Regions:
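Hydrophobic ligand-binding cavity/cleft-lining segments
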Residues: 13-65
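Short beta-edge strand/loop motif at the mouth of beta-sheet-based domains
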Residues: 33-34, 40, 53-88, 92, ...
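Hydrophobic/aromatic beta-strand elements that line small-molecule binding cavities or substrate pockets
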Residues: 36, 89-94, 115-123
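Hydrophobic pocket/interface hotspot
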Residues: 45-46, 55, 73-75, 93, ...
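Beta-strand/loop substructures that line and gate deep hydrophobic ligand-binding cavities in soluble
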Residues: 109-156
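Short, highly charged C-terminal tails/helix-capping segments
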Residues: 163-171
Length: 171
């Protein structure tokens, strides 16, 4: 088994408010959660996710990352995967603490709202445990599809990360 995954069950929709005004609409109380062991030091694993050069090694083509809170992350894919996907995504970086934690926001697959991705890197004797959580999906049919797409997408992405860092295999 490459890692462990959990889909947090819904406890009902949540509405986010600021000064009694709705700012994001109704969101699902569902989270994509994955964790996997990567047999490498936390700095190496972190840099493979939180730098443009690192992302381009295994996942993207031409990614850019300003790895500070308030910076931006920008993913670019060209002819990626079986569908030869070409596209871009990105958003603000909320937290960047090398080699422990990286948090950013980016567009859901539908492109109509942002989700939050939190990635923690925990050193263990045999390498680094990468724990990823993504949340903030709209409570709608489109939001559910975005959620399901990310469940499968992150499963593939963390497997690709593991194979790249441990064995130098690039997809």
């Amino acid at each position: 088994m490459v890692g462990r995954a959990a889909i947090t069950p819904p406890d009902g929709p949540v509405s986010l408010f600021q000064n009694n005004e709705e700012i994001m609409g109704i969101i699902m109380d569902r989270k994509v959660e994955f964790s996997t062991l990567v047999r490498a030091q936390p700095e190496r694993v972190y840099d493979s996710i939180a730098t443009g050069e690192g992302l381009d090694g295994w996942f993207t083509t031409g990614a850019t990352v300003d790895p500070i809170a308030g910076g931006e992350i920008h993913f670019r894919w060209k002819d990626h995967g079986l569908e030869n996907y070409t596209g871009e995504n990105g958003g603000p970086i909320l937290e960047a603490r090398r080699p422990e934690r990286f948090v950013f926001r980016w567009k859901a697959d539908s492109g109509s709202y942002l989700t939050t991705v939190e990635i923690d890197f925990t050193p263990v004797a045999s390498g680094t445990v990468v724990k990823l959580m993504e949340y903030g999906y709209e409570d709608s049919p489109v939001g559910m599809q975005d959620f399901l797409n990310r469940v499968t997408g992150w499963a593939q992405a963390l497997t690709l990360l593991k194979f790249y860092v441990e064995h130098g295999v690039k997809y």
